[in-house]
């Protein structure tokens, strides 16, 4: 029997396809056996990975506006360290390391897209007060809310729709973790790639053999085209951006590139062609130049960027509309569980799950904590503003949770920036309507956006962890 188990290291044939009527999925780790999962080894390594990759994700996110998904490289490292330590039955431990470590990217994504704006605005409005407590609590409570809101949708995405969603990142991470059962050699390519990337950036930064940001302005004809036709091309040659494109994948890297080309080759020169002799300052009275007098970079900053933000926000609305059927189906499943009979005490290991009553209580308790946070620290004791804010945050976070999970399940990337921008727009409009304006209003909108952004980012990352646990047969309630 042992020999059969050793030979069958690998995912079953029906792991990535819909199950036939009456067919069951049998994971690698037997549901009737116990395996080492949450212990000192896995938790400490998971925390170490979270610290390391939080710094990397924050650097890339603040620099290029994209946060890479850390699950795959962390899975590779987990396999490598467990192999080096010659740990037996390390698959469950490696999943926990990957799950804890991957939280780094999702929390960072929730913070860097909104909270740095507080410091940017503080430079313009010195009366604004920004403190670490606001950023910490908004990220903490937002992350908890995202997990609690996602759990009712777990069965729908993970088991009921088995084989219908590709889960690209979860698939890659699972394959890496499974390969670790045969040896820890998967970590070698990651270390080798890190050395190459570090050497590449060292040469650029230290010796300056070429500029990290290449632009067509470096040559005479490029400068002339930029001034006359408002056409300019730029490319970042850094190793970090190159690696990010590899992780995102050719398809979505091409989509991002196409969006940039449309902005710089169509929108920017198009505005100069259509409105060249006009001063468009309806939303920024400080502008006094005509469009033709501006450089392409200024046109991009003042106009094209806003058009792109509007497009991203609209994509978030479309995501909710498309996910409405999923919301109804998943809520229906959760309602059935809440109204159903009590679950048997002796259930197999992988069927242990938190009851919907616990989830409902936890969600209400977390929402109350966020309400208190808004009341005492953000809204300065205003009851109306606090109630309106929590209704907005809870409603938007719940609706967008399915959008985040659906995006991760299909394409492996979370459109959290677009959903956050939509939140900021709605929060700003509604809070102004109820009388919250000025510096306090801006801080409130950004903190609300931070809570929602972290919740959505955590929901997207958590659905990946749950799918990996389903494929490999981990206990759902043990995942962080």
Residue ranges, per PLM feature:
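N-terminal alpha-helical transmembrane segments of multi-pass membrane transport
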Residues: 2-129, 150, 154-174, 178-225, ...
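Hydrophobic core segments of alpha-helical transmembrane domains in multi-pass membrane transport
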Residues: 46-57, 75-82, 113, 139-151, ...
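Flexible hinge motifs at transmembrane-helix junctions and intramembrane kinks/re-entrant loops
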Residues: 62-70, 151-152, 207-211, 246-258, ...
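Short, non-helical or kinked segments that cap or interrupt transmembrane helices
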Residues: 64-74, 164-169, 250-258, 409-423, ...
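Membrane-interface helix-loop-helix modules in multi-pass membrane proteins
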Residues: 82-162, 245-276, 280, 296-315, ...
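Inter-helical loop and helix-membrane interface segments of multi-pass membrane transporters/permeases
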Residues: 118-134, 162, 180, 204-245, ...
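Membrane-embedded translocation segments of transport machinery
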Residues: 368-464, 470-471
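Residue-level detector of conserved catalytic or cofactor/ligand-binding positions
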Residues: 475-480
